[in-house]
């Protein structure tokens, strides 16, 4: 994808379950994050393209704290946004099956005139056709040594409590999770490429959001 027209992200305040803060390009917005995102995205675009512009991003599990009382939310120790979206009108579509690249320039958000759109489109095509040095030669990846932030006994106790609540009818669905961490000095894109080759999946995305934060959804 090319440059985003604007950026939306929200992060829950530590230890609060209902107080959410939404930022639009660094400016705080006092409104429900999902309602605001729905308002600012253009609807009803007729296009033959598989993606006609709009919002791309993610909303994490902790967003439920804005709408349901789930008790105390654990302290955020890594600083990753609970919700993050980019709004696009200029982007590239990679068709891996047909081995084609589609260049898309639109004005649905910026309101640029047609001459500006055509000029931007031509510049992107020129950049793509310009021979560039190979800066993305994958490096050999070393095995990672992971550590978990929850001890096994603690996690198994969480499982036992969840089963008990389900049997008693107080809960019908539960998602238990824990975070694994490892030191990694290589390029995140190389890790993603290696994962895509060694263990491909239809649900596999490399998401580059903010400085020093890269997400791989698998």
What is each of the regions a protein language model found here?
Residues 1-218:
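Extended alpha-helical targeting/anchoring segments
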């Amino acid at each position: 994808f090319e440059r985003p027209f604007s950026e939306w992200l929200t992060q829950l305040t530590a230890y609060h379950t209902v107080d959410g803060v939404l930022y639009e390009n660094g400016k705080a917005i006092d409104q429900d994050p999902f309602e605001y995102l729905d308002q600012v995205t253009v609807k009803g675009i007729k296009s033959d393209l598989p993606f006609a512009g709009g919002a791309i991003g993610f909303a994490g599990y902790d967003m439920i704290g804005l709408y349901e009382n789930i008790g105390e939310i654990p302290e955020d120790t890594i600083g990753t946004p609970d919700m993050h979206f980019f709004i696009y009108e200029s982007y590239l579509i990679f068709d891996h099956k047909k081995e084609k690249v589609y260049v898309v320039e639109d004005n649905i958000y910026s309101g640029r005139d047609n001459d500006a759109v055509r000029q931007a489109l031509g510049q992107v095509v020129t950049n793509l056709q310009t021979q560039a040095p190979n800066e993305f030669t994958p490096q050999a990846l070393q095995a990672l040594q992971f550590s978990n932030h929850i001890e096994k006994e603690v996690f198994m106790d969480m499982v036992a409590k969840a089963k008990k609540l389900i049997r008693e009818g107080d809960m019908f669905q539960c998602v238990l999770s824990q975070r694994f961490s490892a030191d990694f000095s290589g390029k995140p894109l190389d890790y993603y490429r290696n994962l895509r080759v060694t263990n491909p999946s239809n649900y596999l995305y490399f998401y580059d959001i903010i400085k020093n934060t890269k997400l791989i959804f698998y």
